[in-house]
């Protein structure tokens, strides 16, 4: 059973990246929530993963780990930094533009956007680590 699940890890990672991308676009363009600078950096890491993981899942190509894992880990680090900006009093970032990077916007009423982003990048990274070829 575990072997079967591990063979679908690339598909699950692709699904997580698709959901993250759709949520990002939904909040930006349909709800008109302006993203901060760190959100743009996280998008730079997330958006290519949709294409990269989609193609690699279709081709069952595990060499994608070389390209996708660094993107997921960099995105995770940026998201965790933004969570720290929001949660630790006194932390500031000078490059924030009109929208402050420490502004809290809750998804579904209980989780902040950067925390959801960090969880998504963490899930993608772990799914890539545990992925095996389909049989």
Swiss-Prot record:
Topology with respect to the bilayer: Multi-pass membrane protein
GO molecular function: protein-disulfide reductase activity
Primary subcellular site in the record, as a coarse category: membrane
Record-annotated membrane-spanning stretches: 7-26, 41-60, 67-84, 109-131
This protein's GO CC annotations: plasma membrane
Disulfide bonds: 36-39, 96-101
Superkingdom, taxonomy of origin: Bacteria
Gene3D superfamilies from the UniProt entry: DsbB-like
Database matches in InterPro entries: DiS_bond_form_DsbB/BdbC, Disulphide_bond_form_BdbC, DsbB-like_sf
Keywords: Cell inner membrane, Cell membrane, Chaperone, Disulfide bond, Electron transport, Membrane, Oxidoreductase, Redox-active center, Transmembrane, Transmembrane helix, Transport
Localization: Cell inner membrane
Biological process annotations from GO: protein folding
Family, as annotated: Belongs to the DsbB family. BdbC subfamily.
Physiological role: Required for disulfide bond formation in some proteins.
Protein's UniProt name: Probable disulfide formation protein
The organism of origin for this protein: Chlamydia muridarum (strain MoPn / Nigg)
């Amino acid at each position: 059973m575990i072997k079967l699940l591990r063979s679908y890890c690339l598909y699950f990672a692709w699904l997580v990246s698709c959901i993250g991308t759709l949520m990002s676009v939904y909040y930006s363009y349909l709800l008109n929530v302006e993203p901060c600078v760190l959100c743009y950096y996280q998008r730079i890491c997330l958006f290519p993963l949709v294409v990269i993981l989609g193609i690699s899942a279709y081709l069952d190509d595990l060499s994608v780990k070389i390209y996708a894992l660094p993107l997921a880990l960099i995105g995770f680090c940026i998201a965790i930094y933004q969570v720290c900006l929001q949660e630790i009093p006194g932390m500031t970032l000078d490059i924030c533009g009109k929208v402050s990077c420490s502004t809290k916007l809750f998804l579904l009423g209980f989780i902040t956007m950067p925390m959801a982003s960090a969880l998504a990048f963490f899930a993608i990274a772990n799914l890539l680590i545990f992925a095996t070829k389909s049989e």
